[in-house]
């Protein structure tokens, strides 16, 4: 752990969220079975080492899990120009007015020209429609004899983070997806949810733990680094989210009965916290959120959080620091490294209790 910079200063600078992680700690393969990933339980009083299939022992009857049901699309398309040059197209999101059109990023030896075609197979190709800002393009997808969804499933690859290499592309299509995913739209998985199994849900239900769904389509911004040292100047990326009225009702009933709202992942946290109105009341919501949660933020909905270990200098690490405090986060990450926990998307996870008032002076 980098003791000279990690959590130095007052937490307003990017360098205050840096730490050193040996490459050996970065998980390159998912745990099998899913729920055998390790679980670090973080309370103010200390750290407990557990396993995800023991989550039922850490929750209580009346608790409510909030699950992000977004589904990762196979957004990486590898093709070639008619001339033979190789091209990679990374789909970002569809044009809401024209579903066959997608905002995307491209990688090739020479920039594509408007009107140029990229072929993925005899029955599936893309055509460049427009060049846009930030290196993005608009492409039209064409499938012959099949639907676009079927073509993407057949030819596309899962958009794994750049720190994962040499994985099994076929295995990734099932393992880089939660068992409760149902709404297409993400280009990265809500990784805290990857550890759940149907059998674990049965055990949770038997204990009296319930759950509801929200949707946040994880975007490319989750991979992009923060580029400014002064965090006040960071332009937070936007992501589309939806919180429906039935989920709001379940959350309100849970809190009224003394249960705890357990957000599964930072995406569930952002969805819930960005759906609170100016009077502090949780409301159904739909649209883009750019909520940037960092130390100093006061949580209004979330009582407990499940989340994996996050990259240095990331907004996700800052969100966790806001929830548990920077002092406790430093303790937890040092413990995890010392105990050889597996980090990042395919790695282990944590169950976080919130920062106590008496801890705030330690951060």
From Swiss-Prot:
Keyword S-adenosyl-L-methionine: yes
Gene3D superfamilies: QueA-like (3.40.1780.10)
Main location: cytoplasm
Domain of life: Bacteria
Membrane-spanning intervals of the chain: none
Catalysed reaction, written as an equation: 7-aminomethyl-7-carbaguanosine(34) in tRNA + S-adenosyl-L-methionine = epoxyqueuosine(34) in tRNA + adenine + L-methionine + 2 H(+)
One GO BP: tRNA wobble guanine modification
Keywords of the record: Cytoplasm, Queuosine biosynthesis, S-adenosyl-L-methionine, Transferase
An annotated Gene Ontology molecular function: S-adenosylmethionine:tRNA ribosyltransferase-isomerase activity
Pfam families the UniProt entry points to: Queuosine_synth
Record's subcellular location: Cytoplasm
GO cellular component, one term: cytoplasm
EC number(s) from the headed UniProt entry: 2.4.99.17
Function: Transfers and isomerizes the ribose moiety from AdoMet to the 7-aminomethyl group of 7-deazaguanine (preQ1-tRNA) to give epoxyqueuosine (oQ-tRNA).
Protein name: S-adenosylmethionine:tRNA ribosyltransferase-isomerase
Organism: Magnetococcus marinus (strain ATCC BAA-1437 / JCM 17883 / MC-1)
Lineage: Bacteria, Pseudomonadati, Pseudomonadota, Alphaproteobacteria, Magnetococcales
